[in-house]
Amino acid sequence: MGAMKPPSRKSCYNFRVTKINRVIDGDTIDVTLDLGFSLTKKERVRIAGVDTPEKRTRDKEEKTLGIDATNWMKEKLTETIKGDEELVIRTELVGGVGKYGRLLGWLYVGDATLSLNEQMITEGYAWAYDGGTKQKNFEELREIRRSFGSLVES
C-alpha cells in the first residue's frame, strides 16, 4: 500500500507548535499548539502517513526498532527546539482529528519541503501507512537503515 500524500500548503490547516511536551512513540507526540490571540491548546498528534514499530510489545525485534523510531523522533524534535526553526503541523482534515481522536498531521520544520513523516520512511524508521492493513516487515526497515549507516547491529 502506498503512503498518504502530505497536504499542499494551500489546501490545509497549519498549526504552529510552541512546545513539545512528550514523544509517546515514533508516530505519536504530545504538543502545545499556538491558536493565535495568545491562546494555546495541548494536543496529542498522530503522525500521518506512517506506522512505526511498537516499543511496548513482547516481540524483542519490534521493541528494539520501536525504541529506535521513538529516539529518532525525539532527536529530530530536540534539534528543532534548539535551533531557530519553527515546527508546523499540517492537516487536511476538518478539525484535523483522526479516528482515535488525535490530531492527524504532517510535521514540517522551518521551510522544509520534506516532512519529518516522509523522512522517517526514507531513513527506515517507519513504514508508509494509508490507514489500511499495517505491515510488519522489520527486515525492510533494517535494510534501509543499513544503507543510511544508521543501524547498529548486535
Label every PLM stretch briefly:
Residues 1-154:
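Small beta-barrel nucleic-acid-binding modules, primarily SNase/OB-fold domains
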